[in-house]
Amino acid sequence: MGLRLATFNIENLMSRFDFAGFRNALRQDRALSIYQIDDQRQYEALEAARAVATTDDTRQLSALAMAAVRADVICLQEVDNLEALDAFERHYLYRMIGRGYRQRHVSRGNDGRGIDIAVLARDETGEGQRIEIRDIQTHAFRTVSDFGLQSSELAEMGVDGGQKLFRRDCVVVDMAVGGRPFTLVALHLKSMGPSRDPDIPGREWTMPMRRAELAATRQILTDKFDGGPERMRWAICGDLNDYRERIVIHGEFEEEFRFEHVREADSSLDVLLEDGFAFDPTQKLDPMQRWTLFHSRGPGRRHLCQLDYILLSPKLAKANPDAVPQIERRGQPWRTIVPPGQEVERFPRTGWDRPKASDHCPIALELNI
């Protein structure tokens, strides 16, 4: 009995205009930075026009990327609200692609920008098995002390026991696929920056927060399944904003690039993976093929890494020994530098930097439930 599961950071699926760039140059779009803008009213009119002009191409590409992975159930990150998701599903996924998702849920989480986690499901799998969402639980309201995860590292970040733990949410979805129970955990963890200490990189500075989020996720699953989560069918999906390895890119524009595979000494993902609590099926891919994001801060600061994951319970991993993830890269912008042999034919109208489907690649996995 097959279920095709996917996760995708859709990158700012917004229904609101963001006018913060008028007072904060770091938030201003680069196109507007070229022009002399006299007042806030003019800025807001120009920003609204810019956003509307670019949205259609961007969301066509997002829909193409989602359609390409053919998921029965998909977790999305960076969704503004249910209204934005409904409009995208109706006008892009359904009308443009021809097959949509009738079951849709958006969590109202803790993100300061209001970007939330969404879960979409079809009524049936591709094999015709009914998908029934039976319960959805949010953990956005739970605090650090609820999980007993207070620490000196979090205190140094300014996080005390009374603060909400999840930067967005931990959404637990209980469903039945062809009558068989399956639990999906949807996450979007704390980002890797910025750092408040100029001597500590953003990833290192923020890692205690992601460790705590994953430790809490582990507690939630352990409590839910009475101390025996290894015996149950569950998967963790989402943008976990950390990596255990990366591909460092050496070279300059229009030169021959060199790619160096680097293992990281420490990762928040170790909380789930180090002792076999969960399994990462992307490990079946070649190390040079696991990446889902191209990171660039200019020459000498470029790498490819995996931030997006579908992690399986021991029971589900054992039942799917040959399941290999599909990473869809045709919506990546042309500026993404890829290792030899990984070139793909981009979707039509993909730009050098934009429009693009997202800065992330969707990842999908066919599972035997």
Each PLM stretch: what is its role?
Residues M1-M96, Q103-D116, G161, G351, ...:
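N-terminal, active-site-proximal structural segment of metallo-dependent hydrolase catalytic domains
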Residues A84, R113, G193-S195, Y243-I247:
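Extracytoplasmic/secreted cell-surface and envelope-processing proteins
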Residues E11, V79-D80, H188-K190, L240-Y243:
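Catalytic metal-binding/acid-base residues of hydrolase active sites
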